[in-house]
Amino acid sequence: MKRYLIFGAGAIGASLAAQFELNGIPYLLCGRGEQIRHIQAHGIRYVRPEGARSLGLQACADRSELVLTQGDVLVFTTKTQDLELACRDWAWLPVAGSGPARTASELPVLTPQNGLAAERIALRWFSQVYGASINTPARYTELGQIVVGGYPEPGLVVVGRYPQGEDELAAGIAADLCRAGYLAESRPDILRWKAAKLISSVRNNALDLFEGPSDRLQAYAAALAQEAIAVLGAMGISPARAQERRHSVSHWGIAPGCGIEPGQQSTWQSIARGASHEVDFLNGEIVRLGRLYGVATPFNQAIQQAVGQLCQPGRSAQGVCRGQIDQLLSAARELAARAG
C-alpha cells in the first residue's frame, strides 16, 4: 500500500494531510519550524464550509525519526522557491526493505506547485516525477489553522507523469485523491494543465498586493494573462481548457462565507505571515520564458520588479505593503517602450 510523505505543512500540505486523515489514507506530514511543532503538540484546526474540527495529524519534524519504505510517494508541497533545498535534503536518504529503490531519489515524487519550474527542478534529484495541477482555495495565515473553502470537494487535481505520459501510478495517485475527497484525474499532458493554472496564477496572485481603480486592475490582469498566453504559445504549449476535464466541475466553487477572502491569495498570505513569496516563479517564470523565446513581457516584468521592491526587508513591518496600480501601469509602459 502506498504511503504519502507530505513535505510542507502550509495550506496545501496540511489540508492534504487532513483529508488523508479523515479518509483513512496512509500519510505522514513532514516539515520544519513552528507550524509542524504546533501540529505535533496540538493537532490542527481544519475549517471547511460545513464546519471546523480539531484533528490530530501524523507529523514528523525530524528526518532522523523517519524510515522511508519501498511504497512511499513523496509529495513536495513547499513553494517553488523552497523546492530545491527540499529535494537536496531528501533525495539521498536510504530506503528500507527489499525492492528497486535504494535511496529516496528512486521513489516517485509529486509536485503540485504553481508554475512550470517545479518538475524541472525535481528531475535533477528524482527519476520519477509526477506533476500535479491543484486548485484548492485555502488560507493559512494563523498558526495551527487551515481554512479550505472549496465546496463540495476541497479541490480539483490533475496528475500526470512529467514531462508527459499517463501510467498506473498516476492513475493510482488520482484514485487516492478521489478517495480523500478531491475531484481528481490523471492525464498524459500535465504540462498543459499546469500551464492553464499558471495563467490564472499570473493574472491574479501578485496583483493582490496593488490597489487602485478596479477597471485599471482588471486591465492589468488581462495584460498579464495575454503575455502568459503568448509565451506559452511560443513554447508550443496549448493550455488545457476546463471542458477537457473528464469530470464535470460545474457544481464546484468557493463556498460563500467560508473564510476565503477575495484579494488574499497565496502571495498575499505568504507576505502576511512574513514568509517568502513565489512571484519570481509565477510572473517571473513568464519573464524568464519570454526572454528565452523572444516574447516581450513588460507587464509581468514590471509586477515582478514591483513586488520585489515591496517585499524588501523592513518594508512589511506594518503588515502587507500595497503598491499603486497607476505606478505599476507606468512602469510596464516604460518597459514596453524600451523593448519596442
Segments (PLM) and residue ranges:
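Nucleotide donor/acceptor-binding cores
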Residues: 2, 72, 107, 155-157
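N-terminal glycine-rich dinucleotide-binding loop that anchors FAD/FMN and/or NAD(P) in oxidoreductases
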Residues: 44-61, 201
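N-terminal glycine-rich phosphate-binding loop for ADP-containing cofactors
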Residues: 202-223
